[in-house]
Amino acid sequence: MIQMQSILEVADNSGAKKVMCIKVLGGSHHMVAKLGDVIVVSVKEAIPGGKVKKGDVYKGVIVRTKTGVVRPDGSTIKFDKNALVLLNKQDEPIGTRVFGPVTRELRAKKYVRIMSLAEEVL
């Protein structure tokens, strides 16, 4: 579960390395974000020459969490780190590649484009 002030890694090649959550979208009582939720983030670390700069504010969709997700068959998928993919104003991925695995739960949230860019879908 991701809340305000959480530090996440960026799983795409947009140029950002680490971001901090500054707002969880989805209503006034939405305090934590889970897999597939959209949050507003600020870039804390970026590589030189990337598409994004340090201090920029973007939306991002969460693709991996430490708390994981429980599937209807009872299995649980957890990851070592929290990660997201940065989105532009039209809610499309900024990067052209997604590093690491993503989960099938993104399909229900209408993020098929991220699934097609990913190396592996669990």
UniProtKB/Swiss-Prot annotation:
One of its GO terms (cellular component) is cytosolic large ribosomal subunit. GO terms for molecular function: large ribosomal subunit rRNA binding; structural constituent of ribosome. It comes from the Bacteria. Keywords: Ribonucleoprotein, Ribosomal protein, RNA-binding, rRNA-binding. The keyword Lipoprotein does not apply. One of its GO terms (biological process) is translation. The keyword Cytoplasm does not apply. It holds the Pfam family Ribosomal_L14. Binds to 23S rRNA. Forms part of two intersubunit bridges in the 70S ribosome. Belongs to the universal ribosomal protein uL14 family. Part of the 50S ribosomal subunit. Forms a cluster with proteins L3 and L19. In the 70S ribosome, L14 and L19 interact and together make contacts with the 16S rRNA in bridges B5 and B8. This is Large ribosomal subunit protein uL14. The gene is rplN.
